[in-house]
Amino acid sequence: MSEVKYKRVILKLSGEALAGEKGFGINPPVIKTVAEELKDVYDMGVQIAIVVGGGNMWRGEAGAQMGMERAQADYIGMLATIMNALALQDNLESIGVPTRVQTSIEMRQIAEPYIRRKAMRHLEKRRIVIFAGGTGSPYFSTDTTAALRAAEINADAILMAKNGVDGVYSADPNKDASAVKFDTLTHLDIINKGLQVMDTTASSLSMDNDIPVVVFNLNEPGNIRKVVAGEHIGTTVRGK
């Protein structure tokens, strides 16, 4: 194994990151690039689990605002994450990376049901595991799924891959020229300051289980490799 800081990671990948500039759906060149970046990290010997969002296809909150029952809208969002997971699996396997998709909502014809011990076994057997379907319950985000699965599989860190954002700022740098980028923060800082890293439930889970979160720009080639190797990029959130 190459020298790495984090040997088992959860990569939180937003649905929007798979859409590219189109902003909706799956952009084939983009998802191919993501798969190639992951293969580079996989070849370092890192155990990789992925939680993928579905915002490139559907958002439960948006559905609720249109008058849908919130739980029903969230279930549609869970199905969107599964579509993204299957597309990512296909791209990874096409370049020789063994990959398993586990869903929190059973659909055995296309993926395994989520079983913690089986997921850990896959990682030990050098397979990438993609967790899809969120937590399987409405009202919980895929950020919370990432924190929950990270705790369950004893991940060393959660890698929050952002679409064009290179870390955590005191304000939106696109709107406020005085915005300051943070190199390090605590989980309580995130919660108390209301910083847009992950939702409060996900932050609390990460804090309670002492899981570091690294926020970085996915669009910069080689950044996933840099994070797992311990290079300081983006913003690292750890401790209380």
From Swiss-Prot:
Q: Give the residues the record marks as binding ATP.
A: 12-15, 55, 59, 163, 169, 172
Q: Where in the cell is it found?
A: Cytoplasm
Biological process (GO), any one: 'de novo' CTP biosynthetic process
Task: Give one GO term, molecular function aspect.
Answer: ATP binding
Q: How is its activity regulated?
A: Allosterically activated by GTP. Inhibited by UTP.
Which transformation does this protein catalyse, written as a reaction?
A: UMP + ATP = UDP + ADP
Q: Which domain of life is it from?
A: Bacteria
Q: Where does UMP bind?
A: 54, 74, 135-142
Give its E.C. classification number: 2.7.4.22
* The entry's keywords: Allosteric enzyme, ATP-binding, Cytoplasm, Kinase, Nucleotide-binding, Pyrimidine biosynthesis, Transferase
Q: Which GO terms describe its cellular component?
A: cytoplasm
Q: Which pathway? A: Pyrimidine metabolism; CTP biosynthesis via de novo pathway; UDP from UMP (UMPK route): step 1/1
UniProt keyword Ribonucleoprotein, yes or no: no
Report residue spans for region: Involved in allosteric activation by GTP: 20-25
Chief location:
cytoplasm
Task: Note the InterPro entries from the entry.
Answer: AceGlu_kinase-like_sf, Asp/Glu/Uridylate_kinase, Uridylate_kinase, Uridylate_kinase_bac
Top-level EC class as recorded in UniProt? transferase
Subunit structure of this chain's protein: Homohexamer.
- Give the record's family classification: Belongs to the UMP kinase family.
| UniProt cross-references to NCBIfam families, sorted A to Z | pyrH_bact
Question: What HAMAP family does the database record attribute to this sequence?
Answer: PyrH_B
What function does the entry list? Catalyzes the reversible phosphorylation of UMP to UDP.
Q: What is this protein called?
A: Uridylate kinase
Gene, per the UniProt record: pyrH
